[in-house]
């Protein structure tokens, strides 16, 4: 078990990581000032069926505790569910001293966090992640819902009071979700902890290695990379954009293929490979792209689909939040551990994407 301290301009809080940290929830809630009036747990059907009662039992508090459960899947991070959650909150008499508890993966963390950010102009919430992917999204305060024209386009910055990362919850994950979350671990290693990157290559030969002490080690190394960036740039005006390494193409693939048809991590993995492919050309450096490609494929990450229309993907990349004045801005790598946001012309991206697509066949 280990605590990771997060410090931003707006709030300080701890990430509790370990096999027995769920019991910390009671103390966290009881110690909040002003006192918590009641607790709303937001979850999805898959997670609720496995873990909702466990969390309710762990919450040994006097306050009224109720739940709001949505269907599972990224497409459920919608305005309709956001609105329905507000309705449930009002019907159950949530007030400004209430607490929302986000029980689930990144989708639930984003949805519940945005409900908390907007209900009565902002109430407190706690993240209880149940996926490896959420080691990224649960920390840092970015909360949002999707719009049909783009992912995470409606949202806010709203820091949690705490993050309780009870690792036994992750054991029920299917392989594709382990792979999806591991992509963000790789991202954090590549942009901010080269020592972790080398450790991963040695110690994580298959996704089956992501358990017990190795899992806790990974979380306690990857989360501080995110924490360090967020402490410098809470609202993504500068270096926080570095955390979007691999996401410009990744989000475009999610949008083109349809949310739920490719996991976020699979999209980011393809996006990171493309970013390395393009970085070698832009910076005239050797980043061992071929070795990286084989390493990714070993874990089962997909290739860039050969039947996608490249020009369509370029246009979707221009809808990315980093885009400025209609120009694509990507996070590129000068060397392992050193990344920058770079403006890239449509033509350069198009040519590189075509070459990348052919290389991945």
From Swiss-Prot:
InterPro entries: Dehydroquinate_synthase, DHQ_synth_AroB, DHQ_synth_fam, DHQS/DOIS_N, DHQS_C. The keyword NADP does not apply. One of its GO terms (biological process) is aromatic amino acid family biosynthetic process. Binds 1 divalent metal cation per subunit. Can use either Co(2+) or Zn(2+). SUPFAM superfamilies: Dehydroquinate synthase-like (SSF56796). It is an enzyme of class 4 (lyase). It comes from the Bacteria. Pathway: Metabolic intermediate biosynthesis; chorismate biosynthesis; chorismate from D-erythrose 4-phosphate and phosphoenolpyruvate: step 2/7. It catalyses: 7-phospho-2-dehydro-3-deoxy-D-arabino-heptonate = 3-dehydroquinate + phosphate. Zn(2+) binds at residues 184, 247, 264. Its cofactor is NAD(+); Co(2+); Zn(2+). Keywords: Amino-acid biosynthesis, Aromatic amino acid biosynthesis, Cobalt, Cytoplasm, Lyase, Metal-binding, NAD, Nucleotide-binding, Zinc. Coiled coil: none annotated. GO terms for cellular component: cytoplasm. CDD domains: DHQS. Its EC number is 4.2.3.4. GO terms for molecular function: 3-dehydroquinate synthase activity; metal ion binding; nucleotide binding. It is found in: Cytoplasm. NAD(+) binds at residues 72-77, 130-131, 142, 151. Catalyzes the conversion of 3-deoxy-D-arabino-heptulosonate 7-phosphate (DAHP) to dehydroquinate (DHQ). Belongs to the sugar phosphate cyclases superfamily. Dehydroquinate synthase family. This is 3-dehydroquinate synthase. The gene is aroB.
